[in-house]
């Protein structure tokens, strides 16, 4: 009986560890500063290569928009929106470009209280600043 209970606990623990996150963070960076609180997130770095994500939540009445500010000196970064383990490309930021936009989200995100913003490099990125607000 003890062995059966031990095996069940082990299987349950393994299942919980494997199903915790839907999106993976894997990167190398120098001077990386991140913040994620409620419906706002930001990331600033000197150099960055890899993938990072932020979980944004909104409360109350929704405008279904994403305020987005970004600048990048060198490299190329894809910005995705993720829901339920799937991701959709919002835009690509290339070196020398900067954005200050409000993006109206598709109808399929109307009922979503939580979204993920996924930042994924194509090339090594230098001197980047990204800010998001989910409304």
Positions of PLM-derived features:
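Exposed aromatic-hydrophobic patches
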Residues: 55-56, 100-107
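Short, surface-exposed beta-strand/strand-loop-strand elements in extracellular ectodomains
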Residues: 74-91, 132-134
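Short proline/glycine-enriched turn/loop motifs at strand-loop junctions of beta-rich domains
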Residues: 61, 71-76, 123-125
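Edge beta-strands of jelly-roll/beta-sandwich modules across compartments, strongly enriched
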Residues: 120-135
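C-terminal motif of bacterial Sec signal peptides marking the signal peptidase cleavage site
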Residues: 15-19
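Transition segment at domain starts
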Residues: 21-57
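Positively charged n-region of N-terminal signal peptides that target proteins for export
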Residues: 1-8
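Extended extracellular/luminal ectodomain segments enriched in beta-structured repeat modules
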Residues: 59-66, 110-112
